[in-house]
Amino acid sequence: MKNLNVNKNSVISRLINNYLLSHKFTIFFALIMMIISAGATGLHAWLVQPALDEVLIKGNKEMLLLIPIAIIIVTLCKGLATYAHSFQMSKVAHSVIAKLQTQMFEKLMYLNLNYFNDSKSGNLISRLINDTYYLRLAIVKSVTAVIKDILVIVFLLGNMFYQSWSLTLFAFFAFPLAIWPIKKIGKSIRKITYEIQNEIAKFSNVLAESIKGIRQVKAYNREEYEKKRAFATINFIKKFFIRSAFVSNRLSPLMEFIGSLAVAVSIYAGGVFVLNESMSTGQFMSFLVSLLLAYQPVKALGNLNISVQEGLAGAERIFSLLDTSLEKLEKHENSKNIKLKGNIKFSDVNFSYTGQKVLNNINLSIECGKKAAFVGLSGSGKSTLINLLLRFYDNYSGEISIDQKDIKSLSLFDLRENISLITQETLLFNESILDNIRYGNMSCSDKKIEEIAEISGVSKFANELPGKLNTIVGESGIKLSGGQRQRIAIARALIKNAPILIMDEATSSLDNLIEKEIQLALDELMKDKTTIIIAHRLSTIQNADVIFTLEKGSIESKGTHEFLLKNSAVYKKLQLQEDANAH
């Protein structure tokens, strides 16, 4: 609820200045169409008077022909104008929402990892989809209602005053009574909608987790648990929607009552005027038709506040994302197309996360083209070193340099363009094998990808698939085995051909047999590259040029496999654990 203190006027002003004004010509054209549509409604009401007075009472045969023709022409003009302004305003709304969604997605792509660590994916997805949905409705309804419905009321009021100004004052005496409850209901709806959107975000998160982790759910027989978790959120959403309906639906009977008062007073007073011959029957009926036609736009303006408040609640959540602190944004300077060799050095590097020391006075160097491995117990800081080298986090002390260049002096694009990363969990997109490999180098030709697929061993299994390299892998590569996904990851890194290669427990999820099968592909990948390996199994790093052992965020020892077996307590412990697990 903390974001509800955002100033409503500032949100509206921002929407108008930053998003709606760029469509001012389209909105102006729609406004002209609204004037025509509203004027046609007023003309419909006015035509009742000559239809009664001139045709039915006076028997004017010329008017008998003209009035039906006039009604057809007015109706046609109204229909065309209504279509035009409705289409144009929908186009504006969709354009505004597309711009907001583009800005939000761009913002998400450039936020640092800290932001994602503190956020739930369902909440972020909800802002992009649900909040923009509410705002889209608000833009279409509010602009159309505020302009068109007010214009309709103005034209109808004009006809009512034309027929009888005194009767008009009688008819509208009760409408000011509706202002306070409309305002009160609107505020309540805004608060409830904000809660609904938060709960929908939670539900999106539960849904995403349950579907993504469906194998774990089934393996642990947790279907009932996930049902309870989802049902609890669904019930919260249901309660908020019921509250919203309870509050918003109060407005309808209120407007019905006020409308009936206006009609009752008008019929009584108008009847008196007609009986006193101060008003003709045609004038009274024209007045009454105008009053009845005015009821719907007046009611729509009352309900409009509900749509506006729902849209504002969505806009607040959208802008809270767009206004994320600059401290949480990665700084993407322009690329200078720097090509690095791969001499890496950490000098007095310290790093804390959420107040806890993670790395303590790290000093190390890795020569260009050498293979370095990092081992240690879980939580010793191995992956954190990689995160700092890739500048996923910048709030460390000390210096990290590549080729004697402080990595903070490099643009993020240049730095990361010189590094290939293979992780334990291979991210594959729901596209073809070919496109998933191309992700490493978007300008690469199909022929080059086919060559890389052969080298990495991807072709070995792809050729057995119906679509070969054009086979769709499924969401997160679900249609492939772990070894097959890892081969694609290797191919992706090969095609990027960066001078620095990082393998963060890249083969830890594979069994020994599969690991040996892809070792040739890995050897090809590591050739002539500075390679950093975060190791799970010591057997995979015995040929490393240097191995660093980490303990509680500090380097305990470094050396070759043989040296560490004799001199490192941490390394000995890890070797004993591996030997025990092998038996």
Regions found by a protein language model. Give the residues of each.
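Membrane-integrated ABC transporters
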Residues: M1-T41, L56-I67, H85-M89, A93, ...
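Juxtamembrane loop-to-helix connectors within ABC transporter transmembrane domains
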Residues: V11-I12, L20, H85, M89-S90, ...
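Alpha-helical segments in transporter systems
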Residues: N17, F25-W46, I67, I71, ...
